[in-house]
């Protein structure tokens, strides 16, 4: 998780633990045999993936790294936990696996970040990364449009570019470093009815909405949230029971460096 001005809310984030965990398990299933070394959960958040990593790598030291003190306080299942800016983090020893689930999308300059992380690995080690690539979807484009329209003094997206690149753009970054596997998946998420909120807003409010809400006063945030709820009613119509279906695209990469 990124460490922004306002810390993360572990309780709000955990509401959709199952939906957020499935992509991590899909990524972990593609991790090959590993050399000797630690396993690092980079951007570990509340520790949702710790148990799965422990089962997969039972004989290794498991380290959780995150920039959020609140998330680290509730994260369990690690042999060690480190509070650190994941963009500048340095391991104590070269790890066998750096596993990063839904964290690196908060950082830019992936053409430099990913080679740096790969360079920290033990020979034959693996970098496994999953990131949302949802920026063009209505759930995210509506946030930008509403923020720029309602608060132009604070939000300007005229030169904005998403941090996560198209999948093919990662190939020339990663291929010189070792064996690469790249793929995308779209998950059709069923979001249960939410009292007083559109289900998609309830899903995004602890993640994609945070950078916007952090810059707003309480009355502004209330108005922004109401406008966002209204926009979502048109793009993600509710089912008869009040639930909503939300397609969600995610990008996966597994790099095993040459030994």
Where are these regions (language model features)?
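A conserved beta-strand element that flanks and buttresses the S-adenosyl-L-methionine
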Residues: 99
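Conserved class I S-adenosyl-L-methionine
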Residues: 1-34, 48-52, 71, 208
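Helix-to-beta-strand junctions that scaffold the AdoMet/dcAdoMet cofactor pocket
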Residues: 107-108, 121-123
């Amino acid at each position: 998780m990124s460490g922004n001005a306002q810390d993360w809310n572990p309780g709000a984030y955990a509401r959709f633990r199952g939906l957020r965990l499935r992509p991590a398990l899909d990524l972990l299933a593609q991790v090959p045999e590993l050399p000797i070394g630690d396993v690092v959960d980079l951007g570990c958040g509340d520790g949702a993936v710790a148990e799965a990593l422990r089962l997969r790598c039972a004989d290794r030291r498991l380290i959780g790294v995150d920039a959020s003190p609140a998330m680290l306080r509730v994260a369990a299942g690690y042999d060690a936990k480190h509070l650190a800016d994941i963009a500048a983090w340095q391991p104590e020893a070269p790890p066998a696996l750096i596993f990063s689930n839904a964290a690196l999308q908060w950082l830019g300059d992936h053409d430099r970040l990913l080679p740096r992380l790969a360079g920290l690995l033990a020979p034959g080690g693996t970098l496994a990364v999953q990131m949302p690539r949802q920026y063009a979807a209505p759930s995210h484009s509506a946030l930008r449009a509403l923020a720029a329209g309602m608060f132009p003094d604070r939000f300007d997206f005229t030169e904005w570019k998403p941090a996560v690149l198209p999948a093919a753009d990662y190939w020339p970054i990663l291929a010189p470093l070792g064996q690469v596997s790249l793929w995308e998946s779209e998950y059709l998420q069923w979001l249960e009815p939410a009292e007083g909120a559109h289900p998609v807003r309830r899903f995004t409010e602890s993640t994609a909405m945070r950078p916007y809400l952090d810059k707003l006063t309480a009355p502004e945030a209330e108005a922004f949230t109401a406008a966002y709820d209204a926009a979502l009613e048109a793009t993600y119509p509710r089912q008869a029971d009040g639930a909503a279906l939300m397609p969600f695209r995610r990008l996966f990469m597994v790099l095993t460096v040459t030994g």
